[in-house]
Amino acid sequence: MATWLAILLIVAALIIGLVGGFFLARKYMMDYLKKNPPINEEMLRMMMMQMGQKPSQKKINQMMTMMNKNMDQKMK
């Protein structure tokens, strides 16, 4: 009977470790992406120039605000 208990405890610890590791890694990545967004103002400016638009600071600020708001909604 002790063997079954040991196996059960090992499996339970493994599952708890996997779930805990998943959530810790998820939180770390969310914080990392918030501090280092995948796109910044300079990248937006270059994209707009490549599309033939004149990048005004107002447009860039609007796009960054929109992207940050969208990112915050996805994180919740």
Curated annotation (Swiss-Prot):
Membrane topology summary: Single-pass membrane protein
Gene3D superfamilies linked to this entry: EF-hand
UniProt keyword annotation of Cell membrane present: yes
Any matching Pfam family: UPF0154
Record's subcellular location: Cell membrane
InterPro entries xref list: EF-hand-dom_pair, UPF0154
Residues passing through the membrane, by range: 4-24
Keyword Transmembrane: yes
SUPFAM superfamilies assigned to the protein according to its UniProt record, in alphabetical order: EF-hand
Protein keywords: Cell membrane, Membrane, Transmembrane, Transmembrane helix
Entry superkingdom: Bacteria
Cellular component annotations (GO), alphabetically ordered: plasma membrane
Assigned protein family: Belongs to the UPF0154 family.
Name used for this protein in its record: UPF0154 protein Sca_0984
Protein's organism: Staphylococcus carnosus (strain TM300)
